[in-house]
Design a protein with these regions (language model features):
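Charge-patterned, long linear interaction tracts outside catalytic cores
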Residues: 14, 20-21, 38
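Long, non-coiled-coil amphipathic alpha-helical linker/lever segments
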Residues: 34-60
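PLD/PLD-like phosphodiesterase catalytic module centered on the HKD motif
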Residues: 1, 6-9, 13-15, 24, ...
Length: 175
């Protein structure tokens, strides 16, 4: 069984303009999680099991991202500083924003690539000294969503379709 997780949509009209990433995998756990997710989409019934590999909104994505930010804070040390890298179209969610500020104040380095709206103000002494925000503007619309956590050397990478907006994290079904 093969599964594909992508960072955007499959709309043929925008495919020539958007740059996205995709993961083609034969990992049985990812495949099983995606079957459960599609069963939810087609039946409307809430899944009874927990996803083992994927993060899904509105079920667990936001809570898991907040937990990963908190974990980065707790694992960060002078010998092994924490690092969070996020690339999304927008960062509007107030809870994620607050968590990133907390991480910055705990000396976690945060690198954000945000194409559009961003609630974070980098470089504010005592609040966001450790946050760098850039926006990439070019010929192709940067459309990918990537979440990276150093996790004390046990690095984690996630890709998906959800931006860090309340509507994506709390209202829409997204992976």
């Amino acid at each position: 069984r093969y599964a594909h997780i992508g960072t955007g949509n499959y709309h043929s009209g925008t495919a020539r303009l958007y740059s996205d990433f995709g993961l083609l995998t034969c990992d049985p756990a990812v495949g099983s999680d995606l079957i459960e997710f599609f069963n939810f989409l087609t039946s409307g019934c809430q899944p009874k099991r927990r996803y083992s590999k994927i993060l899904v909104s509105p079920r667990n994505l936001k809570d898991q991202l907040l937990a990963k930010i908190d974990r980065e804070i707790s694992k960060s040390s002078s010998r092994s500083p924490g690092l969070i890298r996020l690339k999304t179209n927008a960062l509007e969610d107030p809870d994620i924003t607050e968590a990133l500020y907390r991480a910055s104040m705990a000396d976690v380095k945060i690198e954000l690539i945000i194409r559009d709206t961003c609630r974070i103000r980098p470089g504010i002494p005592g609040l966001s000294d450790n946050i760098r925000v850039i926006s990439v503007v070019g010929r192709f619309l940067e459309h990918s969503r990537i979440y990276y956590f150093r996790n004390g050397g046990n690095e984690e990478y996630f890709i998906g379709s959800a931006d860090l907006m309340m509507r994506n994290l709390e209202s829409r079904a997204e992976v």
